[in-house]
């Protein structure tokens, strides 16, 4: 142990503790004090630090070097004791500068992203076989933020207090500049910018800076990174897949494609690009950089998962400035899709809240609901804050539901409010981290899910087969299931399984049925045809105020009306099979006139189809006038509206399945082909009924690349134009030349064991439980959005709790 001793005033701070680790690694004796003792202090104590709780002059060892930071008052008892004793006093930034003298220093500064960029650079160097020293403003996976190594030293340089004037690094990164900590610069942005400019000129080799930032670009010299085409390291593309991002960059005429990093959000792609630029400047090879970024373990309190439950997600993030909050929530939204995002925000410092009040309320657009709690003062004097007015501003400007809940009541409120599938994000640089710890093992109550099947349509039996298959994939960890069977006569039965009695059903108004229906949280309608798939059931569920899965009222009504679908799509330039609508009134008035019009429009064979039934119900292939007449009469027995369609016999039947919100996040399964024994695939062959083999489903569809892309593009266009919701299957006819026509839309596709809908998504990498979850998530989101417009349940609950 070296004889020299260092004493830290405020050793539990993230910046101070990093330097304490380095000094301990180098053999120095270290002591320190702080106003509280947390995990950081506990780690240092286990490493040999002598810790004192509170600030008292007797804590300062004789002849020690006393380290202080910008937040330490000159009236601090230990600071005064060091002055009186003649101890050497050194600012944290000066000590950091001294510690880096014998190594190649890489300093990262800027308003946002310092910790992530410095952590990424450190991990890349470690992957390259180096053992860098590092002093970082966040804990790694091992709970360490500082370490002494050799050759390289990676550190954060705090731009907030002007202390970066102490550094002259070999390499540097300036991530960005924001109106943050301006009070330390007399409110003058130019003084902050001048300090960064001075820092860049003192960089001895290369200063990497954000080339997308016009303020930096106007006054700095160095290498740029960013999405702007003039950047030296130009980010050409990026995409996010779940909790990973992929980006392509060009640097010095070399293209680096699909670089993967275990981070989310455009801001983190920028951070990864900055780290990659530094690594390339150091001569580190591409494979090493890729491997390091792909395996990057992350930093604690940077979208760190805190809970153990599998039915909801609780994340913690250090974001406390409005721009950080906005980036974090948008990244989470991209990762979790339609799941409800509940942001819990603890504003950091009264002064920062006041400085950022102009942009703070609009920072939460990526969330669905926001819980605002008490400001973390960070040592500042308490100020009056109208949390009610601030919550109203957030609701208005971010278009979310927002409520204030006192910090002491947060845990209890969340335990009542968190719902299966929720994603909670605790935001702040204060002590909001205790929330994640307290909810680590919390489990929300299961969702009560009501599965409705059967129905009055002629597809009653297929509905039950679909329900029986789907029921196998309703996870008992997520749902308590109540089954509702609608008889062919429109009566209802209910039970805890699909093995329902043969007794006559009851009306929907029966106390047992109505009572059970009122208690479920969300409805899963597995219904085909009229009264279930055509908007009737959807309208009923909206009227009684129940969330439901699958298509919305409007999408179901349009999708199940084949003529209306054809009219809309034809008007929008999408090819449809030529058709002629026929009304019951017109047919009854003058059959001969109708037949003449039909034969003038089409030649035999042709098809007679019911407007509101499934893809193979009420469909008749006809070859002469007598068959045509009989088929029309039969079709009108099944439906009030009929249409005649030109034959597409000989064409292939190609289908594309969808999940999600056509105006937001949705998923497309790869196309598949349905092949029959020859000719039209009727209802019996489609589902393998009456002892017949079901139609063959082919997933590796043999179509030209051009036709595939065009057909998928049109299918997606249809789903978007109709603002598809929940689920659907869109069917096409494709001829040998690659021409195709829209056939129809199925809002609730068959989900039997023989149906391709579930299998199509399984081939895409989903499992069947995930498909059910997605249906539920979309249904809940759609309901929540409508509820926000007519009520504010979160605010009401918060007020009631007070």
Curated annotation (Swiss-Prot):
A GO molecular-function annotation: D-alanine-D-alanine ligase activity
GO biological processes: cell division; cell wall organization; peptidoglycan biosynthetic process; regulation of cell shape
Region (UDP-N-acetylmuramate--alanine ligase): 1-445
UniProt-listed Pfam families: Dala_Dala_lig_C, Dala_Dala_lig_N, Mur_ligase, Mur_ligase_C, Mur_ligase_M
InterPro entries: ATP-grasp, ATP_grasp_subdomain_1, D-Ala_lig_Van_CS, D_ala_D_ala, Dala_Dala_lig_C, Dala_Dala_lig_N, Mur-like_cat_sf, Mur_ligase_C
Residue span, ATP-grasp domain: 566-777
Residues noted as binding ATP in the record, renumbered to the chain: 110-116, 599-654
Cofactor binding comment, as recorded: Binds 2 magnesium or manganese ions per subunit.
Family annotation (PANTHER family): UDP-N-ACETYLMURAMATE--L-ALANINE LIGASE (PTHR43445:SF3), UDP-N-ACETYLMURAMATE--L-ALANINE LIGASE-RELATED (PTHR43445)
UniProt name for this protein: Bifunctional enzyme MurC/Ddl
Native source species: Chlamydia muridarum (strain MoPn / Nigg)
């Amino acid at each position: 142990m070296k004889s020299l001793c260092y004493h830290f005033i405020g050793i539990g701070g993230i910046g101070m503790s990093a330097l304490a680790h380095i000094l301990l690694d180098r053999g120095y004796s270290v002591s320190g004090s702080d106003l509280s003792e947390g995990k950081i202090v506990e780690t240092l104590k286990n490493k040999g630090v002598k810790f004192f709780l509170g600030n008292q002059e007797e804590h300062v060892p004789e002849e020690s070097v006393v380290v202080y930071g910008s937040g330490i008052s000159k009236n601090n008892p230990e600071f005064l004791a060091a002055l009186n004793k003649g101890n050497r006093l050194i600012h944290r930034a000066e000590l950091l500068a001294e510690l880096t003298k014998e190594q190649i220093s890489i300093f990262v500064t800027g308003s946002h992203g310092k910790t992530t960029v410095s952590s990424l650079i450190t991990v890349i160097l470690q992957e390259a076989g180096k053992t860098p020293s590092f002093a970082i403003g966040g804990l790694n996976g091992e709970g360490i933020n500082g370490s002494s190594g050799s050759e390289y030293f990676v550190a954060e340089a705090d731009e907030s207090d002007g202390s970066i004037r102490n550094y002259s690094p070999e390499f540097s990164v300036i991530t960005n500049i924001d109106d943050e900590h301006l009070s330390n610069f007399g409110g003058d942005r130019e003084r902050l910018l001048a300090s960064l400019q001075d820092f860049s000129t003192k960089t001895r080799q290369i200063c990497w800076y954000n080339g997308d930032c016009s303020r930096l670009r106007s006054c700095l010299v160095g290498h740029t990174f960013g999405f702007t085409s003039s950047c030296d390291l130009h980010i050409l593309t990026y995409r996010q897949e779940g909790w990973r991002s992929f980006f392509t960059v060009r640097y010095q005429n070399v293209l680096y494609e699909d670089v993967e990093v275990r981070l989310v959000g455009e801001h983190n792609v920028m951070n990864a690009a900055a780290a990659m630029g530094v690594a390339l400047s150091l001569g580190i090879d591409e494979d090493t950089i890729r491997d390091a970024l792909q395996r990057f373990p992350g930093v604690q309190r940077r979208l760190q998962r805190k809970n153990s439950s599998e039915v909801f997600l609780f994340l913690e993030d250090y974001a406390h400035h409005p721009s950080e909050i906005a980036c974090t929530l948008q990244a989470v939204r991209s990762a979790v899709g339609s799941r409800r995002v509940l942001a819990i925000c603890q504003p950091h410092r009264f002064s920062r809240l006041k400085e950022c009040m102009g942009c703070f309320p609009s920072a939460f657009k990526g969330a669905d609901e926001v819980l605002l709690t008490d400001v973390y003062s960070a040592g500042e004097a308490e100020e009056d804050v109208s949390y009610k007015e601030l919550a109203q501003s957030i609701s208005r400007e971010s278009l979310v539901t927002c409520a204030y809940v006192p910090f002491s009541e947060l845990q209890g409120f969340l335990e009542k409010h968190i719902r299966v599938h929720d994603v909670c994000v605790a935001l702040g640089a204060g002590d909001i981290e205790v929330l994640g710890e307290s909810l680590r093992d919390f489990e929300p109550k299961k969702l009560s899910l009501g599965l409705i099947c059967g129905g009055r349509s002629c597809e009653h039996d297929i509905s039950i087969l679909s329900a029986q298959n789907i029921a196998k994939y309703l996870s008992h960890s997520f749902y308590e299931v109540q089954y509702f069977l609608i008889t062919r006569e429109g009566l209802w039965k209910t039970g805890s399984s699909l093995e329902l009695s043969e007794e006559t059903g009851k009306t929907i108004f029966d106390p047992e049925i109505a009572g059970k229906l009122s208690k479920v949280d969300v409805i899963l309608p597995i219904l085909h045809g009229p009264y279930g798939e055509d908007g009737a059931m959807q309208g009923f569920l909206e009227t009684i105020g129940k969330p439901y899965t699958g298509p919305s009222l409007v999408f179901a009504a349009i999708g199940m009306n084949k003529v209306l679908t054809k009219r809309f799509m034809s008007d929008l330039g999408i090819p449809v099979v030529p058709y002629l609508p026929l009304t019951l009134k017109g047919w009854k008035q003058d059959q001969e006139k109708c037949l003449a019009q039909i034969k003038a429009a089409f030649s035999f064979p042709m098809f007679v189809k019911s407007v509101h039934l499934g893809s193979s119900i009420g469909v008749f292939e006809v070859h002469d006038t007598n068959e045509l007449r009989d088929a029309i009469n039969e079709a009108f027995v099944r439906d009030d509206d009929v249409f005649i369609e030109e034959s597409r016999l000989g064409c292939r039947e190609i289908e594309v399945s969808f999940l999600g919100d056509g105006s937001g996040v949705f998923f497309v399964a790869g196309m598949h082909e349905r092949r029959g024994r020859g000719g039209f695939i009727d209802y019996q062959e489609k589902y393998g009924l009456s002892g017949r083999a079901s139609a063959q489903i082919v997933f590796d569809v043999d179509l030209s690349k051009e036709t595939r892309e065009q057909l998928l593009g049109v299918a997606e266009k249809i789903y978007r134009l109709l603002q598809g919701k929940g689920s659907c299957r869109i069917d096409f006819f494709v001829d040998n030349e690659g021409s195709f026509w829209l056939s129809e839309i199925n809002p609730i596709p068959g989900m039997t064991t023989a149906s391709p809908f579930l299998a199509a998504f399984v081939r895409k990498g989903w499992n069947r439980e995930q498909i059910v979850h997605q249906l539920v998530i979309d249904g809940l989101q759609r309901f929540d959005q409508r509820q926000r417009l007519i009520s504010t349940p979160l605010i009401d609950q918060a007020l009631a709790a007070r």
